[in-house]
């Protein structure tokens, strides 16, 4: 049973700003994307890695493939994340039994998380890390609170999201014209109920410059 990691690194980072996509910015001695690549490289539960990058970054793709032995190949992504994932799934079809789809701008995954997810997906077929909501959650329309959502049932979902390959591939095939906000939604649309694995809030997505400040602090405090 083979498991591949599909690393989505094709985003341009418009909200972040700057000329270099945030996944290729340096945190100390490594690019943001490399932190998760290091984990996949060292996990005995991951057999291969495929990276999808933006157009114009061939040099970085080549560097990463040379540096990390589990990186089988890289290719260019699309202009939307869902299309990038679909392309990645097409590229690895028939090569693996399970796939872990990961956002390159979530650098702080670890080996223990990967192990938990891979062991769980063998029986659940769709699983993702998540952190329970700690703040009170309001449903708001046009700036006005409509109601309060019980936070004990609210989780903030992260990546990598791990699937039985045939399940997620079939879901993307069926709903290829629908752009859901994460991969779990595709299998949810089939009636599947994914499993959640509780995780640390350190596995956040770097979206803004403030997030990068937090990421640098984490590296300096815990990873140097």
UniProtKB/Swiss-Prot annotation:
Gene3D superfamilies: Spore Coat Polysaccharide Biosynthesis Protein SpsA, Chain A. Pathway: Isoprenoid biosynthesis; isopentenyl diphosphate biosynthesis via DXP pathway; isopentenyl diphosphate from 1-deoxy-D-xylulose 5-phosphate: step 2/6. It catalyses: 2-C-methyl-D-erythritol 4-phosphate + CTP + H(+) = 4-CDP-2-C-methyl-D-erythritol + diphosphate. HAMAP family: IspD (MF_00108). One of its GO terms (molecular function) is 2-C-methyl-D-erythritol 4-phosphate cytidylyltransferase activity. Catalyzes the formation of 4-diphosphocytidyl-2-C-methyl-D-erythritol from CTP and 2-C-methyl-D-erythritol 4-phosphate (MEP). PANTHER family: 2-C-METHYL-D-ERYTHRITOL 4-PHOSPHATE CYTIDYLYLTRANSFERASE, CHLOROPLASTIC (PTHR32125:SF4). The record marks 15, 22 as: Transition state stabilizer. This is 2-C-methyl-D-erythritol 4-phosphate cytidylyltransferase. The record marks 151, 205 as: Positions MEP for the nucleophilic attack. GO terms for biological process: isopentenyl diphosphate biosynthetic process, methylerythritol 4-phosphate pathway. Pfam families: IspD (PF01128). Keywords: Isoprene biosynthesis, Nucleotidyltransferase, Transferase. Belongs to the IspD/TarI cytidylyltransferase family. IspD subfamily. Its EC number is 2.7.7.60. InterPro entries: IspD, IspD/TarI, IspD/TarI_cytidylyltransf_bact, Nucleotide-diphossugar_trans.
């Amino acid at each position: 049973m083979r498991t591949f990691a599909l690393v989505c690194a094709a985003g341009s980072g418009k909200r972040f700003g700057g000329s270099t996509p945030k996944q290729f910015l340096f945190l100390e001695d490594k690019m943001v994307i490399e932190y998760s690549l290091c984990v996949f490289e060292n996990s005995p539960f991951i057999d291969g890695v495929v990276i999808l990058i933006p157009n114009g970054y061939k040099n970085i793709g080549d560097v990463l493939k040379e540096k990390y032995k589990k990186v089988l190949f890289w290719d260019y992504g699309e202009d939307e994340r869902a299309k990038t994932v679909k392309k990645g799934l097409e590229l690895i079809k028939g090569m693996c039994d399970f796939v872990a789809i990961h956002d390159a701008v979530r650098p702080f995954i670890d080996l223990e998380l990967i192990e938990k997810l891979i062991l769980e997906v063998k029986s659940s077929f769709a699983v993702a890390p998540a952190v329970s909501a700690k703040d009170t959650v309001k449903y708001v329309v046009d700036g006005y609170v409509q109601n309060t959502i019980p936070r004990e049932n609210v989780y903030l979902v992260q990546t990598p999201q791990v699937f039985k390959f045939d399940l997620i591939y079939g879901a993307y095939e069926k709903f290829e014209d629908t752009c859901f906000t994460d991969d779990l939604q595709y299998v949810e649309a089939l009636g599947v109920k994914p499993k959640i694995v509780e995780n640390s809030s350190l596995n956040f997505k770097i979206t803004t410059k403030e997030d990068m400040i937090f990421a640098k602090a984490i590296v300096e405090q815990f990873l140097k």
